[in-house]
A protein has these predicted regions:
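N-terminal mitochondrial targeting presequence
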Residues: 1-39, 314
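Membrane-interface amphipathic helices and adjacent TM-edge segments
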Residues: 73-161, 226-261
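Interfacial loop/helix-cap signal at membrane boundaries in integral membrane proteins
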Residues: 29-61, 182-197
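Hydrophobic alpha-helical transmembrane segments of multi-pass integral membrane proteins
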Residues: 60-69, 131, 135, 150-174, ...
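Hydrophobic alpha-helical transmembrane segments and adjacent short intramembrane/lumenal linkers
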Residues: 178-313
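Transmembrane alpha-helical insertion/packing segments
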Residues: 13-14, 29, 33-37, 58, ...
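Membrane-water interface at transmembrane helix exits
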Residues: 81-82, 169, 173, 177, ...
Length: 314
């Protein structure tokens, strides 16, 4: 009797070890230890959650963790940035446009006081040159007054999202490191969560979703923004016709994102299935987030335009 109980007791650690293979960490640092502990916590969470028996628990937990972390850590900053962008486009730009006649008038007075001489074309060129300098300074003042400077608006979402994205990718990659229980779970075209998708379906989906996010950014653009872009394009063409070199940051940014869409396919093809699933889920969430925020912004612009017309008519 005692020997039987002893034998059963000795089997329990081996059964636990079979359920959770022990992985050797060559060199423990604070980062590697934290990543390892988080990956173990993820595996425990997947088993603890009450998923239906027919659902793959680890894959569903990856999707759930992705959605929850995006909702908690990225959506608030994206809304914050969208509000700042809205103030810049609907408060700063109209006010600056309203002040441009007075800026031109002040520049002409300054030129008369300075005794500027030249033909008509030279005078117009000088007025435009000085007006651009004054308008740029005034724009910076208005952006600061309305708390919508472009640099924090662009940088804050990147600063908050990038560490989360990299850290979560490292956690899921660590969870897929052999030996792991993820070997036995398949999902979609993944024969195993610990191996890359041999069909390249998920990496290609990732590239398509990323490209769709880039190209769909113009779907909800207002008529004022389109008109302003056309004016900028015309102004750029005129400057290039005169032999000037003009850089367009927005087009450079769009081109870089398109290249990134292709690059993500190549990178995603080399990472484990857990990371591929996380990246595709995160990109899909980001696409719907962009659509939702852009639609919300479009509706807000429409309401703002209606209220402005009502004020003018009153």
């Amino acid at each position: 009797m005692f020997s039987t109980r002893t034998a059963l007791t000795s089997l329990r650690p081996s059964l636990a070890a079979a359920r959770r293979p022990q992985r050797h960490i060559p060199r423990r640092t604070f980062v590697s230890s934290t990543i390892h502990n988080l990956s173990e916590g993820f595996l425990d969470l997947a088993i603890a959650l009450p998923w239906p028996p027919e659902w793959p628990p680890y894959s569903c937990t990856i999707i759930l963790v992705t959605v929850v972390t995006r909702l908690a850590f990225t959506v608030p900053f994206s809304v914050w940035a969208k509000n700042r962008q809205w103030r810049a486009e609907n408060i700063v730009v109209p006010q600056l446009k309203q002040e441009m006649p007075s800026i031109h008038k002040q520049v002409q007075q300054d030129m008369k006081r300075d005794g500027f001489r030249g033909d008509k074309e030279a005078v117009i060129a000088e007025i435009n040159k000085r007006s651009r300098v004054v308008a740029k300074e005034r724009r910076s003042e208005l952006l600061k007054q309305n708390n919508c400077s472009p640099m924090p608006t662009i940088a804050m979402p990147i600063i908050t999202q990038l560490p989360l994205f990299v850290g979560t990718s490292m956690v899921f990659a660590e969870a897929a490191r052999a030996p792991t229980v993820l070997d036995s779970e398949a999902f979609f075209t993944l024969t195993s969560l610990s191996h890359a998708d041999s069909t390249l379906t998920l990496p290609i989906m990732l590239g398509i979703i990323t490209l769709a996010n880039v190209e769909s950014s113009k779907w909800f653009v207002s008529a004022e923004v389109l008109k302003r872009e056309q004016e900028v394009a015309k102004w750029t063409a005129e400057r290039r016709a005169r032999g000037e070199q003009v850089l367009q940051p927005s087009k450079i940014y769009q081109t870089a994102l398109r290249i990134l869409s292709v690059g993500r396919i190549l990178i995603a093809a080399m990472v484990p299935g857990t990371v591929q699933l996380y990246w595709v889920t995160s990109a899909t969430f980001g696409l719907f987030q962009s659509w939702t925020l852009d639609y919300w912004d479009m509706r807000r612009r429409q309401r703002h335009a209606i209220s402005e017309k009502q004020k003018d008519s009153a």
